[in-house]
A protein has these predicted regions:
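Solvent-exposed adhesion/ligand-recognition segments of exported proteins
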Residues: 22-246
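C-terminal motif of bacterial Sec signal peptides marking the signal peptidase cleavage site
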Residues: 17-20
Length: 246
C-alpha cells in the first residue's frame, strides 16, 4: 500500500514538472497583469550611419510651432524640409546628400535585422499595452499596438545594457498624455520599435526608444520623444514637439 501511494505521488509530480517546464512556443499575452521574464538576451542593434539622427525620413519632414530637436535631421530621397525656423535644430541637417543616403541604407539594414529576429521565449502582445511592465527581450504582435489605457513601463532589472525589441506588424499609437516610463536602469537608447506601417503619438504623450517605421511617423501637439524617429519611406510630421536623441 505504501509503495502504491509513493508511485502515485511521483507520477503526479512528474506531470506537474514536465508541464511546467515546457516553453517551446511563444508566450501569448493579451492585456496581462504579469509579463513572463525572458532568458534569451537580445544582441545590440547596429544603426551605423543612422545612429546620429534624431529625425530621419524618406519623403518629407514638416514642422509647425516651436519644435525642438537635439540630434541630426536627415531626409533621402525627398528634399522637402519645412518649419526650421521657427523650429530649433541642435544638430546638422542632411538633405538628399551622400550622408543622408547612407543613413537610409543603414536604417533599412537595422529595420530588417530587428524585424527578422526570433527567440524561443518571445512574448506575443496584442492591442492595448498601457499599464504593462516589460522586461528585457523580444516582443511581437501580428497586428497593431497602442498605449491607450495607462502608461507603459520598461524595467531593465538593473542591467543598463539590456535590450528591448518590439516587432509590430501594423501601426503603433499612443493616446493623449500617455507615457513610457523607464526603471531598473533601462535606457531609451536600448529600446527599439519596428513598426510595419506608421506610428502616431497623441497630444502631450511622452515616448521613449528608437522608432523604425516602414511608412510615416506623426507627432501631435506637445508630444515628446526621448529617442529617434526614423521613417523609411514616408514623412515625419511634427507639431511643437521635443525630440532628444539619447
Amino acid at each position: 500500500m505504501k509503495t502504491k501511494k509513493l508511485l502515485t505521488a511521483l507520477a503526479v509530480l512528474s506531470v506537474v514538472f514536465f508541464t511546467g517546464c515546457k516553453n517551446d512556443e511563444p508566450t501569448n499575452v493579451d492585456n496581462p497583469t504579469a509579463i513572463p521574464t525572458q532568458t534569451t538576451k537580445q544582441a545590440e542593434v547596429a544603426l551605423n550611419g543612422a545612429s546620429n539622427f534624431a529625425v530621419l525620413a524618406g519623403a518629407a519632414i514638416t514642422s509647425t510651432g516651436a519644435t525642438n530637436i537635439t540630434g541630426d535631421l536627415g531626409l533621402s530621397p525627398g528634399s522637402s524640409v519645412g518649419g526650421f525656423p521657427p523650429g530649433v535644430l541642435v544638430g546638422t541637417q542632411q538633405v538628399n546628400n551622400p550622408i543622408a543616403t547612407q543613413a537610409k541604407l543603414d536604417l533599412t539594414a537595422a529595420y530588417n535585422d530587428i524585424a527578422g529576429r526570433t527567440s524561443t521565449d518571445i512574448v506575443t502582445l496584442s492591442g492595448n499595452i498601457g499599464g504593462l511592465t516589460l522586461t528585457p527581450g523580444l516582443y511581437k504582435t501580428t497586428s497593431s499596438l497602442a498605449v491607450s489605457s495607462g502608461d507603459l513601463t520598461f524595467d531593465a532589472k538593473g542591467d543598463a545594457n539590456a535590450i528591448f525589441i518590439i516587432q509590430i506588424a501594423s501601426t503603433l499609437t499612443t493616446t493623449s498624455g500617455r507615457k513610457v516610463i523607464l526603471k531598473g536602469s533601462a535606457k531609451a537608447s536600448n529600446i527599439f520599435w519596428q513598426v510595419g506601417s506608421s506610428a502616431t503619438f497623441g497630444t502631450t504623450s511622452v515616448f521613449k526608444g528608437t522608432i523604425m517605421a516602414m511608412q510615416s511617423i506623426t507627432f501631435a501637439t506637445g508630444a515628446s520623444l526621448d529617442g529617434q524617429a526614423l521613417a523609411r519611406t514616408g514623412s515625419v510630421v511634427l507639431a511643437g514637439n521635443t525630440i532628444v536623441k539619447p
